[in-house]
Amino acid sequence: MIPYGIPSLVLFGACAPLAAHMADHWNRNGMLTVFFIGIGLSSILTGFAQSLLQIGFGLAFIGVFASIYHPVGIAMVIEGGGKIGWRLGMNGLWGNMGVAAAPLATGLILAHFDWRLAFIIPGSVSILIGLGFLAFVRSGGARPPEATRQEKEFVEFAPGWQRALVSLTLVTAAGGFVFGAMTFIIPRLFEVRMQGISTDIAVTGTLAALIYAVAAFAQLVVGRTIDKRTIKPVLIFVAVGQPLFLSLMAMQTDYTLFVVSLLAMCFVFGQIPITDAVLAQYVPDQWRAKVLSIKFLINLMIGSAALMTARYLLSTGAGFEAVMRVLAIAACFIVGAAFLLPKRHKTW
């Protein structure tokens, strides 16, 4: 099945710039409606597939429509200024909760029905959400927030934007590498290093899921902080914590490993709202969807490379220590990028 899912992943990233272009020349609310209904219809069609090839086409269409959210949805979240950090943190938290809930919902459907309904039921829900959002838009409820005075005056790239985007690119690349590898490595690390707690893969898997769920709330804390303080010192703090705790993870077992892993993932998750807030400081609204689409594409490509790197190192017998050292080194680039970021007060 994996080869039939690859085109979906490729299109998920490759179509993001196209989605941004269409949103800029049409309408962000309209594109988000297309996102919900398009994913829903594609998922339902996949559920009615009669061959692996048809499943591959269905998954590919899901990837195309799924590519809309990050460049268009995030641009909507940061539109208008105000408490951007809190909104980004809340958006990221809901996204991570959705990722955590997906395998649980799929498992429940498969336990009581079959694989077809695992596509048809979520697809139907997505269409209903899309229709609800469309009605919300038509009623006038989805108007963008009233822009702050600073946001209204922010029509050109801010001074220092070139240096800021270089910093943002480095943070995105190195952060995507760390995040992509950590989502793969933690369940496997717990399975091997938590023998003193349990040898049941269901228990260690649940502990890994708990790490992701709890650490996701760090986005709210960081989001609130960057609404009140200058971004650069917050990014430096979040960046420095990553190589520190990633290095410590290589040497821990059982309960200590759980605590250190939780702290490491809090710093990893905490970085997510910061990068989009940096973008909001330096990039005017009319360019944000385009820059977000490129940022998302870089993140997806590097994350995939991180996954392959982790698998390769483990297959060669290098062990988890080697993987965690590589991740700690990658995280050091985030620290360097944080110091490279210009110091600038909020523009929202």
PLM features per residue range, with description:
Residues 22-23, 108-113, 190-191, 225-226, ...:
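Interfacial helix-cap and linker-helix signal at transmembrane-aqueous boundaries
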Residues 117-135, 322-339:
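Symmetry-related core transmembrane helices of the 12-TM Major Facilitator Superfamily/SLC fold
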Residues 58-95:
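Cytoplasmic helix-loop-helix junction between adjacent transmembrane helices
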Residues 282, 286-317:
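A late C-terminal transmembrane helix in Major Facilitator Superfamily
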Residues 229-275:
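C-terminal transmembrane helical hairpin of 12-TM major facilitator-type secondary transporters
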Residues 163-216:
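Extracytoplasmic gate region of multi-pass secondary transporters
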Residues 6-20, 209-221:
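Central cavity-lining transmembrane alpha-helices of secondary-active solute carriers
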Residues 13-50, 226-229:
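Conserved MFS/SLC helix-loop-helix module at the cytosolic interface between two early adjacent transmembrane helices
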